[in-house]
């Protein structure tokens, strides 16, 4: 059943088609601010007027958001620009890739300038599909003028029309040929006119008696081109360019794909005549060419309602919602969206960034548009104007389907559109997604449906593809006993009832080939649903999703997570006296970030892991030797919290598969060697915007003892709660770049959680951490614990007190479970039933393990984690 969270998630994550943008600057020109002022990302002003841009709401908002993009400690413009310079020099393509994340296709008007920019097809590397072209007709005309001027002398007397007749015929013939060639070019999907800038939108209808007037206009234009840069800015000629393009598009539509004409309307610099930028002037032209589709660009601001009227009453008119994001304030953006929807069908609205020169123009526009769309659509649903399903359909149409249909792109949104547990309105059904996956992976014969229980055990049900398809089509259901809530790793049920069941619903966004193992299978994560199909709060993935959505819905905070996998590779050994099998380090001449002789022997395995993960779209950020014997670290890319944990689980499985092929065992056991560093699973968590970082952190610290029940979820985990081993030490505190604090601050709104290891159910661990932060923001808690630059355990009590450090970390699972049991706020947020069941399971697990001797307990855990 779709919920408001489903709608919000769709708006924030659905792939988009950017139907109007421009080329990016090359890296060598990306910081030439004297030539390309960076302030123009939020203003159309030029010259002296641009100096006033820093006083606008849009500027302040953009500066704050860009600070989070660059992880700048300050939103001061000079600091932001300095951070940008570093980002451009360090990894320009990485910055672009981040800014274009979520973009399926770019439609580029690549004739804005020929200088300092990358070619249109260079942009393909950053999007899911190939870039397409929008051809600017005034640029074509200027190129023809240039050819004529350089091909021979231009008559001096512009009043002698007979002298220009031949040149006019050549111009009109060559211009028409260029337009016709572009119509036939499959890389071109549309045309654009900037007549709004040149002579205004009041394009005059065709009148054969005006031939003399047209040639006079041409004569003036080419005479000017002979002495300066060719530019068409004479009304009769500009009007003719538009009409001739429309005539050619009309004639070609019988045999060629549909190629609309985009027109700049409204918002622009002081080159435009504001009155003549009103799209109402186009009404007679639109009526004259019903066979050609018109796209009114840039929300026609400030004439959005006039454009909306045209898009409502003429079936060949579409309203583009671009450029005002991020050029105008938040309130104005929401108002423009509301005006656009007053009478315009949602199927006639298109999205574009008008991104140009700077990749950040794309990032800001997409981010602000998604936020405004979410705010407006949620309001409409809450007021009863839309159902949730209608709003989801409209959002998907605006972001993707309308442009896909209008420009005949034949794009399919990737399965990532069905992400993180939200039903989305894609034109592709779940069945189609499965069929597409099978076509792309014909060797897959089985699907492993997976879920993670409270012991962090991955439970698996395997289905032949045809049977799995029945689940996807809802022709059958996959029921699981409720006893799973209270089940230990060895299937002992320690509480609750064996009566009743819940159902696993596949999340097809996680469907992925099972790689690194000799198996014709794929894996998919699942959601837990009730008999009635409702989400269960006991489901760890749902719980994390709900907490993340509360942050977003109530405070506009977007959380992002990324994980470091620390893992020890062990080799099997046999005690010759007893025949008992055990494990020993795979390498011993080994230390942090070194490449020893033994480490080099591991390179084929390490590189196989990296390449195998990349083959399924998981691209490691780095990997290296860690401190303990046989210990390595693999750093995963960041994502939304649920997707990040999904990636973590999948990556661990791939690593285990490959290591087993090499005759080794990969273990997440927290402290395999008492004399060496332990094994963690540190998480990076960031919130955006970072303006609430202090209250968020205050909430985390206030509830941290209870959070540890989820992040350090086994007795063995507390062998790492010690000072001096870079594991977070022993006190509830935080510190900037302090690896002896349980929470290391890295940049504004970005922390590393040190008190976390591979025994944790990571969905629950992240849910608990975010829930604690949520309480701080909701209660506006002050941050009373100061930034600690030391190992708090090494400080005398008076110095700890001066820093506000008063609470020790629980040093046993029993203590952290007791803290959770007494934390009513956290229990309520995570769900009383979930917390109660979790505590039952963890106490029973602790009792079972404590009955074993140390060697047996270690072996038992290494075999399972």
From Swiss-Prot:
Instruction: Give residue ranges for domain GS beta-grasp.
Output: 442-533
Q: What is the effect of changing residue 774 to N?
A: Temperature-sensitive
One GO term under biological process is: sporulation resulting in formation of a cellular spore
Q: Supply the SUPFAM superfamilies for this chain.
A: Glutamine synthetase/guanido kinase, Metallo-dependent hydrolases
According to the UniProt entry, its GO molecular function terms are: hydrolase activity
| Gene Ontology cellular component list | cytoplasm
Q: Which Pfam families is this protein grouped with?
A: Amidohydro_2, Gln-synt_C
Q: Would you say which domain of life the source belongs to?
A: Eukaryota
Q: Which key words tag this protein in UniProt?
A: Conidiation, Cytoplasm, Sporulation
Q: Where is the GS catalytic domain?
A: 540-865
Keyword check for Zinc-finger, yes or no: no
InterPro entries per record: Amidohydro-rel, Gln_synt_N, Gln_synth/guanido_kin_cat_dom, Gln_synth_cat_dom, Metal_Hydrolase
Location in or out of the cell: Cytoplasm
Q: What does this protein do?
A: May function as a GSI-related enzyme in synthesizing a small diffusible factor that acts as an extracellular signal directing asexual sporulation and perhaps other aspects of colony growth. May be involved in brlA activation (an early transcriptional regulator for conidiation specific gene).
Q: Which family does it belong to?
A: Belongs to the glutamine synthetase family.
Q: What is this protein's record name?
A: Protein fluG
């Amino acid at each position: 059943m779709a919920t408001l969270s489903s709608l919000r998630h769709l708006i924030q994550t659905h792939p988009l088609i950017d139907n109007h943008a421009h080329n990016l600057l090359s890296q060598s020109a990306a910081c030439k601010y004297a030539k390309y002022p960076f302030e123009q990302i939020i203003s159309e002003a030029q010259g002296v007027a641009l100096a006033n841009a820093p006083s606008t709401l849009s500027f302040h908002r953009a500066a704050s958001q860009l600070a989070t993009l660059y992880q700048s400690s300050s939103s001061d413009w000079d600091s932001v620009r300095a951070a940008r310079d570093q980002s451009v020099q360090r990894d320009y393509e990485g910055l672009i890739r981040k800014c274009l994340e979520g973009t399926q296709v770019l439609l580029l008007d690549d004739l804005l300038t020929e200088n300092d920019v990358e070619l249109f097809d260079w942009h393909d590397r950053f999007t899911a599909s190939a870039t397409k072209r929008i051809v600017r007709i005034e640029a074509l005309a200027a190129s023809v003028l240039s050819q004529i001027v350089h091909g021979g002398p231009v008559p001096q007397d512009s009043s002698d029309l007979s002298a220009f007749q031949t040149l006019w015929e050549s111009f009109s013939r060559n211009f028409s040929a260029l337009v016709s060639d572009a119509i036939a070019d499959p890389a071109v999907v549309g045309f654009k006119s900037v007549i709004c800038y040149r002579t205004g939108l009041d394009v005059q209808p065709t009148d054969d008696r005006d031939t003399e007037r047209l040639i006079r206009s041409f004569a003036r234009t080419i005479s000017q081109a002979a002495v300066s840069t060719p530019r068409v800015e004479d009304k009769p000629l500009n009007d003719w360019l538009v009409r001739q393009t429309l005539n050619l598009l009309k004639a070609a539509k019988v045999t060629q794909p549909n190629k609309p004409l985009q027109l700049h309307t409204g918002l622009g610099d002081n080159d435009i005549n504001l009155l003549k930028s009103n799209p109402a002037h186009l009404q007679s032209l639109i009526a004259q060419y019903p066979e050609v589709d018109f796209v009114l660009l840039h929300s026609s601001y400030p004439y959005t309602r006039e454009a909306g009227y045209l898009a409502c009453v003429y079936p060949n008119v579409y309203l583009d919602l671009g450029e005002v994001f991020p050029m105008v304030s938040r309130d104005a953006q929401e108002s423009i969206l509301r005006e656009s929807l007053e009478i315009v069908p949602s199927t006639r609205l298109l999205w574009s960034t008008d991104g140009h020169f700077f990749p950040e123009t794309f990032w800001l526009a997409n981010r602000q548009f998604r936020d405004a769309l979410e705010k407006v659509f949620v309001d409409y649903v809450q007021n009863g104007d839309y159902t949730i399903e209608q709003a989801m359909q409209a959002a998907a149409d605006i972001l993707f389907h309308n442009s896909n249909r209008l420009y005949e792109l034949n794009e399919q949104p990737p399965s990532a559109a069905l992400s993180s547990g939200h039903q989305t309105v894609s034109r592709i059904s779940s069945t189609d997604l499965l069929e597409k996956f099978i076509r792309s992976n014909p060797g897959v014969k089985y699907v492993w449906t997976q879920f993670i229980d409270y012991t962090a055990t991955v439970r698996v049900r395997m289905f032949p593809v045809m049977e799995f398809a029945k689940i996807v089509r809802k022709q059958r259901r996959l029921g699981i006993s409720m006893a799973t809530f209270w089940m230990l790793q060895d299937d002992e049920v320690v509480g609750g009832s064996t009566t009743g069941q819940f159902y696993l619903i596949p999340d097809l966004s996680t469907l992925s080939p099972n790689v690194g193992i000799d198996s014709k299978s794929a894996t998919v994560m699942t959601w837990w649903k009730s008999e009635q199909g409702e989400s269960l709060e006991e489901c760890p993935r749902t719980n994390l999703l709900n907490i993340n959505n509360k942050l977003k819905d109530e405070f506009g905070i977007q959380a992002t997570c990324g994980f470091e996998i620390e893992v020890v590779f062990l080799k099997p050994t046999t005690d010759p006296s007893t025949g008992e099998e055990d494990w020993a380090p795979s390498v011993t001449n080994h230390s942090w970030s070194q490449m020893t002789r033994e480490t080099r022997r591991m390179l084929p395995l390490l590189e196989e892991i990296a390449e195998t993960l990349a083959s399924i779209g998981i691209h490691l950020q780095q990997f290296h030797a860690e401190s303990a014997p046989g210990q390595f670290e693999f750093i995963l890319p960041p994502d939304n919290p649920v997707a990040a944990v999904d990636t973590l689980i999948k990556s661990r499985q791939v690593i285990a598969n490959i290591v087993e092929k090499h005759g080794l065992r990969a273990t997440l056991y927290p402290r395999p060697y008492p004399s060496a560093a332990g094994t963690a699973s540190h998480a990076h968590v960031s919130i955006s915007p970072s303006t609430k970082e202090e209250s968020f952190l205050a909430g985390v610290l206030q509830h941290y003892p209870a959070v540890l029940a989820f992040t350090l979820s086994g007795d063995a985990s507390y062998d790492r709660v010690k000072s001096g081993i870079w594991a977070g030490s022993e006190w509830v505190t935080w510190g900037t770049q302090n690896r002896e604090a349980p929470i290391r601050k890295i940049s504004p709104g970005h922390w590393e959680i040190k008190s976390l290891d591979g025994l944790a159910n990571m969905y629950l661990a992240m849910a608990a951490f975010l829930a604690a932060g949520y309480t701080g923001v909701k209660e506006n808690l002050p941050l009373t614990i100061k930034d600690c630059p030391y190992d708090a355990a090494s400080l005398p009590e008076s110095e700890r007190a001066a820093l506000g450090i008063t609470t020790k970390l629980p040093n046993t699972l029993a203590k952290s479970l007791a803290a959770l049991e007494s934390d009513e706020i956290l229990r309520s947020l995570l769900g009383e039933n979930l917390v109660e069941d979790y505590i039952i399971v963890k106490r029973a697990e602790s009792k079972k393990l404590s009955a074993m001797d140390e060697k047996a307990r270690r072996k038992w855990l290494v075999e399972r984690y």
